[in-house]
């Protein structure tokens, strides 16, 4: 598993997972079974004292002089410590003493910003990708508590776990980010979970990321080859991992994996606007069996705007996505034949690019597609063949004022 001569870049595994999932135990297990590899570790903890780094050191996994733990405390590597991360990874890569680097991020870090650090090129034209190669994104989840946490309406501040003032993220949003962007998901504490907890945990992971390899583990005992030097990470491909993205963009190769876990999905599409009150009622009612929903919507009272819907677990959010291209003067459109060709399928002679397009992903035995479609159809308004925004102005609209929000 050591680097070949043709691979001059230091391979890197990024280890993520919410606090309490047990990230440090698989890290220590891998380090104690690394088959002669010289491994450097960067450990990031949000506390003043880097507890995870101390656990790694006390375990004795890196006791040799040719290996090293780099501590990065009191900050999150996806934000405040990005510059420090760049410097440390570059220094370790240029040192040429290590076969591999493992970055254990804080439990409240999202993996995507960490991954983008490797493609970031500074003002001097230097990039981590010149000396290091992002090899595997690993997320560790707690098999016992995943369903409870995924169904929670808690914010990180409710758990006293934030990246600082202004961190208003919900717990489920962080879990979704960590799972959707992973190449490998370690389902830790599998032996402690009930059969039902384990089954639902697998199904949640498959519903969020049909590409991820799921590895069940106890006490973090993960084969090193499952998380080191896998060659799985591909930044552009990783952005298509989420199952909702595949559905909205017509990817069909995910079906066998999702069927194996009893997951099904569908896309609701329509070319008429929603009546705001009716759509708001739908948004605020339970959706049995739905694990994830994401997409775009059009309200009759807001003919120039695209709305975005995002649901995960018990939380549903709606927000302004931006202006419809139909509402933007053509002289401001991108001057690209490729862009125009890509947008052509979305344009209609009557409504332009205004449309409803929402993907629903859920448990095959619980999600009622027909009922969801019927409720959304009932929320539509307007004539099928006519764009009449003036006729819809009188409709009551309970959604926040998008005109006052920054674009």
Positions of PLM-derived features:
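C-terminal accessory "lid"/substrate-recognition subdomains
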Residues: 2-4, 48, 146, 152-356, ...
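Conserved strand-to-helix beginnings and helix N-cap segments that scaffold or border functional pockets
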Residues: 53, 82, 112-115, 195-199, ...
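Short, aromatic/basic amphipathic alpha-helical patches
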Residues: 54-59, 202-205, 372-376
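Nucleotide-state-sensitive switch-loop elements of NTP-binding domains
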Residues: 2-173
């Amino acid at each position: 598993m050591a680097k070949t001569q043709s691979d001059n870049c230091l391979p890197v595994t990024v280890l993520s997972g919410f606090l309490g999932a047990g990230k440090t135990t698989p890290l220590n297990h891998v380090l104690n079974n690394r088959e002669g590899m010289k491994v450097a570790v960067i450990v990031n903890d949000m506390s003043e004292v880097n507890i995870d780094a101390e656990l790694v050191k006390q375990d004795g996994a890196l006791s040799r002089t040719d290996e090293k733990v780099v501590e990065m405390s009191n900050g999150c590597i996806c934000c405040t410590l990005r510059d420090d991360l760049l410097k440390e990874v570059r220094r370790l890569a240029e040192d040429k003493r290590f076969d591999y680097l493992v970055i254990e991020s804080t439990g409240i870090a999202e993996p995507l910003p960490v991954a983008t650090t490797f493609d970031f090129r500074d003002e001097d034209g230097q990039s981590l990708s010149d000396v290091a190669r992002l090899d595997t994104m690993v997320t560790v989840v707690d098999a016992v508590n995943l369903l409870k946490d995924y169904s929670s309406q808690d914010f990180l501040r409710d758990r006293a776990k934030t990246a600082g003032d202004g961190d208003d993220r919900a717990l489920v949003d962080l879990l979704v980010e960590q799972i959707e962007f992973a190449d490998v998901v370690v389902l830790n504490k599998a032996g402690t979970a009930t059969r039902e907890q384990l089954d639902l945990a697998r199904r949640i992971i498959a519903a969020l990321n049909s590409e991820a390899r799921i590895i069940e583990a106890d006490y973090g005992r993960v084969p090193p080859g499952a998380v080191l030097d896998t060659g799985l990470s591909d930044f552009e491909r990783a952005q298509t991992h989420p199952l909702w993205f595949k559905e909205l963009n017509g990817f069909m190769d995910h079906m066998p994996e999702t069927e194996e876990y009893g997951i099904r999905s569908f896309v609701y599409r329509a070319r008429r606007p929603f009546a705001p009150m009716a759509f708001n009622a739908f948004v605020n009612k339970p959706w049995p069996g739905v694990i994830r929903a994401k997409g775009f919507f059009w309200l009759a009272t807001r003919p120039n705007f695209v709305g975005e819907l995002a649901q995960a677990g018990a939380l549903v959010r709606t927000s302004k996505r931006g202006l419809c291209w139909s509402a933007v003067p053509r002289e401001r459109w991108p001057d690209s034949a490729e862009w125009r060709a890509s947008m052509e399928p979305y344009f209609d002679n009557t409504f332009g690019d205004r449309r409803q397009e929402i993907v629903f992903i859920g448990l095959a035995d619980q999600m009622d597609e027909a009922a969801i479609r019927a409720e959304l159809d009932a929320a539509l308004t307007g004539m099928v063949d006519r764009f009449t925004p003036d006729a819809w102005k009188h409709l009551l609209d309970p959604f926040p004022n998008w005109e006052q929000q920054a674009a």
